């Protein structure tokens, strides 16, 4: 059996059905050896670890903690300790966290012994005892301004699946450290057991944070290194993380107020020192002595550097040249400088001679008489459309243009349609029983006359005779006599 490094009573906190309670146990710490790994075992009472076989006492539910899986061992503060004067510390592994407690001296010894056994390369030393010699030649004092990067509480958490955690690639278990100015997420190195920072969130960039019985979550702002989003971590110490973060934020606010007050006091003292002093009047500077600065004036008010004056085209109207400006210096006259003078002289000559030709620019714009109206200046609406009586329009420009003949493709004129011959009328017989008198002067209106054409043998003329229809019919001249 391996020899124990340390053993003694320890209070172990267990949670069942939502209720937390402390249970007194007997803990035994074994180091790593050829016969076993470094571990921490718990028993019901003292002496149970020395018994073997079936006669030994029953172990607790938390049978053994392998120190190879230990992540951190840190002292913590609890609201309800198991007994007065007890100090608690937390042992975090890759699977869960264990909250232990003992009296003040034993708790410190347990923390240092566990750290030395679990982390042999950390250089942990036991607390000084009274038997150890005291070196008075060199005294070391702690710097109150020194703030190590690892200062704060560490909590074992498990990342939950959210949009932000998937974007950052968070999966599995991590260490969440609550520092003075930020939250830091740590992970174990691939080759070494050293904690390496993975992500951090400053308190000033956190939008909100909260806790639950089984988790702790916060919402990061868009200026955080991880980007915006909600991060949720599963842990049984959500309330402890929440209180630690709240205390760090309140402390940071207090430091900010103290800094602002110091700045105000410095400003007031500086104003009080300069209040009794007379400020000398500013010395006027010669604008011509020193060149102006590059950005002394805005862009729209920059002055043009002095240079030889040149008159541009249409720079000044006729007669507005200042007197004495060009005396003694023969300056080149601009182009079209006497155009307006010639135009005015022509207008005067035109008015005096009263010429019939319209000169150029004879009258100002807007005063010239209106030109005579053309043929199509006053369009008229078509009226009396009923007078056309649906007659065809004259064909003309609506016909297609023929480029070969350079003329419109006018169809040939149409010949007039022949008039139809009159249809012959049938013979109308008088009604039976009607008698006509011999003394009648003419024929009745309903009597049809038929001419009988006969050809004479001698003269070759046609003789027309009337056949007697009745007794009263008179003779009719032949068509040849007409």
Swiss-Prot record:
One of its GO terms (cellular component) is cytosol. It comes from the Eukaryota. Gene3D superfamilies: Pleckstrin-homology domain (PH domain)/Phosphotyrosine-binding domain (PTB). Signal peptide: none annotated. SUPFAM superfamilies: PH domain-like. Residues 4-119 form the PH domain. This is Docking protein 1. GO terms for biological process: cell surface receptor protein tyrosine kinase signaling pathway; intracellular signal transduction; macrophage colony-stimulating factor signaling pathway; negative regulation of MAPK cascade; Ras protein signal transduction. It is found in: Cytoplasm; Nucleus. It comes from Mus musculus. Keywords: Acetylation, Cytoplasm, Nucleus, Phosphoprotein. Belongs to the DOK family. Type A subfamily. The modification N-acetylmethionine is found at residue 1. The modification Phosphoserine is found at residues 48, 269, 290, 415. The modification Phosphotyrosine is found at residues 295, 336, 340, 361, 376, 397, 408, 450.
